[in-house]
Swiss-Prot record:
InterPro entries: Aminotransferase_I/II_large, AON_synthase_class-II, AONS_Archaea/Proteobacteria, AONS_Proteobacteria, PyrdxlP-dep_Trfase, PyrdxlP-dep_Trfase_major, PyrdxlP-dep_Trfase_small
Function description: Catalyzes the decarboxylative condensation of pimeloyl-[acyl-carrier protein] and L-alanine to produce 8-amino-7-oxononanoate (AON), [acyl-carrier protein], and carbon dioxide.
UniProt record, GO biological process: biotin biosynthetic process
Pathway: Cofactor biosynthesis; biotin biosynthesis
Protein name: 8-amino-7-oxononanoate synthase 2
Entry binding sites for pyridoxal 5'-phosphate: 116-117, 187, 215, 243
Family per similarity comment: Belongs to the class-II pyridoxal-phosphate-dependent aminotransferase family. BioF subfamily.
Length: 405
């Protein structure tokens, strides 16, 4: 019965163009990767799909730091943080991360998690008890949505970036604890939340602002310190989640907040308490990643990435203008996430296939990840791309625009 039920659902997904497939990366994360799929021989692709925004995932210094960490601390942690898995490497990283966020969160403390998904589940389930209401942007990441659904708090969602509706919801809220929850950079659209206005609402209505900065950490702000730095924000009402497997090039995530909040997560956050700690070698290497991000090299990489973003948007805007009947639309994004909105699922898959045939790896994103009718190619740029790489992508899209029906 179960297998028949699942098979029927799979057939329905295939008919709607929603079936997901995995590819196998046969080489390190980089703009040029050897990739195989469905048992076919691997081929080299020019990839515009990773979240390795600064190109650190295969940086020699991080590769060496990871190896050094393994030699010093071994391969695994062996237990959860509250048993015997909390190593000196984890503690040192948390100290570095707290200092990293101190300009934005007074007296900040930090807690390291295995993944950003776990960090968000931990935050919302531990803080969102029955005395709380969670106010969530409708385009928040799935982990924030799932965390809010698992929490005992009431959840109210507001239309994307609609602060008028949010203000009305806050004004009518009667629970003593109010948690405003938002992505900083929205993962499928690339646009920025209005964090200054959200913080102003938090202060006006005695609420707390939880910011998921998965796609801003390392890329935005002074020395790559993230979206809070980008907007020049500073407040004890800020609760910050940053991921360490995107711009930081490794893995894991962290929460930075008032020490009382971090202490409560240690006591009450089940995804933290009941998870084996990440390998200490990763924590050790992440300290080197923070050094790189804040260094002159990190600044050069961010500047180059910004030039690529401008180049891509300028050239794609011209291409879209030359082919108005295709109905393509470039999302309003100033970040390394540059979605090309195509419309229906079949069109997005056809465009992805046309680029694939040219050796370009750009994923098609479809519902339920994005709203129905907004299927898109999610183009992401890295500091290790070149201007010639971006030109090749634009040329590939131009070729597809001429050939697709």
């Amino acid at each position: 019965m179960l297998i028949d039920h699942l098979n029927r659902q799979q057939l329905e997904r295939e008919a709607q163009g929603l079936q997901r497939q995995r590819r196998i990366a046969e080489s390190p994360c980089a703009p040029r990767q050897w990739v195989s799929q469905d048992g076919q021989p691997a081929r080299e692709m020019l990839a515009f799909c990773s979240n390795d925004y600064l190109g650190l995932a295969n940086h020699p210094a991080l590769v060496e730091a990871l190896a050094e960490g393994a030699r010093q601390f071994g391969a695994g942690s062996g237990a959860s943080h509250l048993i015997s898995g909390h190593s000196r490497a984890h503690a040192a990283l948390e100290g570095d991360l707290a200092a990293w966020l101190a300009p934005s969160i007074p007296n900040a403390a930090a807690l390291y998690f295995c993944t950003g998904y776990l960090a968000n589940l931990a935050l919302l389930t531990a803080l969102g008890d029955a005395s709380a209401t969670i106010f969530a942007d409708k385009l928040n990441h799935a982990s924030l949505i799932d965390g809010a659904l698992l929490a005992k708090a009431t959840m109210q969602r507001y239309a994307h970036r609609n602060l008028t509706v949010l203000a009305s919801q806050l004004e009518s809220c009667t629970t003593p604890i109010k948690l405003i929850v938002t992505d900083a950079v929205f993962s499928m659209d690339g646009d920025l939340a209005d964090l200054p206005a959200l913080l102003a609402l938090a202060e006006r209505f005695d609420a707390w602002l939880i910011v998921d900065d998965a796609h801003g950490f390392g890329v935005l702000g002074d020395q790559g310190r993230g979206s809070l730095s980008h907007f020049g924000l500073r407040s004890e009402r800020l609760i910050y989640m940053g991921t360490l497997g995107k711009a930081a090039g490794l893995g894991g995530a962290f929460v930075a907040a008032h020490p009382s909040i971090i202490d409560w997560l240690v006591q009450a956050a089940r995804p933290y308490i009941y998870t084996t700690a990440a390998p200490p070698a990763v924590a050790h290497a992440l300290r080197e990643s923070l050094r790189l991000i804040s260094s002159a090299e990190g600044e050069q990489r961010r500047a180059h990435l910004q030039q690529l973003i401008i180049q891509l948007r300028t050239q794609l805007s011209a291409l879209i203008g030359a082919h108005p009947t295709l109905g393509w639309r470039l999302a309003d994004s100033s970040t390394a996430i540059q979605p090309l909105i195509v419309g229906d699922n079949a069109a997005a898959l056809a465009l992805m296939a046309a680029l694939d045939a040219q050796g370009l790896w750009v994923p098609a994103i479809r519902p339920p990840t994005v709203p129905v009718g907004t299927a898109r190619l999610r183009i992401t740029l890295s500091a290790t791309h070149s201007a010639a790489d971006v030109q090749r992508l634009v040329d590939g899209l131009a070729c597809a625009a001429r050939e697709l029906p």
